[in-house]
Structure formats: structure tokens, C-alpha cells
Amino acid sequence: MRRAKRALPPVAVVLVLALGVPLAGCGSESGARGDGVSAGKEKGVDMQEAAEQSDAMLDAVLEGIDPDVQWAHGPTTTRACGVTRRRAVMTVVSPERRQTFLDRAENFWRKNGYRIKAVNKDEKFPAVYAVTRSGFGVSVSFRGKGQAFLEADTPCVKESKVAAPTAEPNGPAYENVYPLPRPNVRSDFWSGDQG
């Protein structure tokens, strides 16, 4: 007797991709580091596929931050065997709300099985860094003028061309604009009186 297949909800797909697909940093040809974590280029996964998984992780954490913030794509960079995807938050986040913003990202990651690697409690430039079981590194950090940035670094994967992200920003796309403008969207919750 055959069982009917059910489609997974989008968040479940993101979690399976982020946590269940074995990937990790560059290592030996066999992919073993000796500590139970895969460390080589996994067969079948290339830079484009890993970049798409990074996009899904960034999209998921942004969806987990409530109330919503407006964001735009930052630059994509590639290295010998990996990719970094970025999102820039265009909503003004006041100094009083920055820790709340970081806490929401950190809580989302903890609930979804990410391991928190470091928390920077700097008053001006706080940040949270996490890693998935499959070797993706993700972070949220506040930088110049209090702008929040989200980044996802892939583990080492097979080299390939990498296309631009396909997710539509929830505000202006700022295509071919670098550097991106500073935060310019006000929020009753996130922006406060300062910002």
C-alpha cells in the first residue's frame, strides 16, 4: 500500500535545507574532519544551490522578525569555494531597539536548531553570529549609522556561477546601487524618536 506524499510547508523546506543537507567548510577530499562534521565539498551541491539555501535562511529570519522591517539585497561575493549573501535593513532601528532586533534573530535561530557562535554586546555595533549543522554561517550586525545587516556564508561547495538573488525586496530594490543608502524608512516600533 502506497502512502500519499505531502508537500512540506516553506519554512520546513528551509529548515531541511539549512540543517539536513550535509555541507561544511573546506577540508579533506573525503570530507571527514574526524569530529563527525562534514568538511569537504559535498557531491551535487554547487555554489548556486548553496547561495539559494543562504537566501532561504536570510528570508526566513527576516520573516521571523516582528514587526516587519524593510530590506534590500546587499552585494553577493564569492570566494574559492563559497558564497556570501547579504541583506541590508532599510528601516531605521533606534539604539534602544537594536538589542530587541538582535534578540529576535537569535531566538529564531535557536528555535530552528542553529548554534550561536558569538554575541557582541557592543553598545554601538552589536552583533549575533550563528552556524547551522551543515556549516552555513549567519549573522546580524549593526554598523555605520546604526544600519542592520544580515549575512549568510556558505560552507565550501563545488565551484559554479552564481546568479543574483531572486527574492524581491519588500521595498526599493536599489539595483546597481552601491553602496546602499542608509536606513530611511521609519517604523513606529523600530525607529522610536531617535534613530
What role is predicted for each listed range?
Residues V21-G25:
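C-terminal motif of bacterial Sec signal peptides marking the signal peptidase cleavage site
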Residues I65-G74, N112-V119:
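Short secondary-structure junctions
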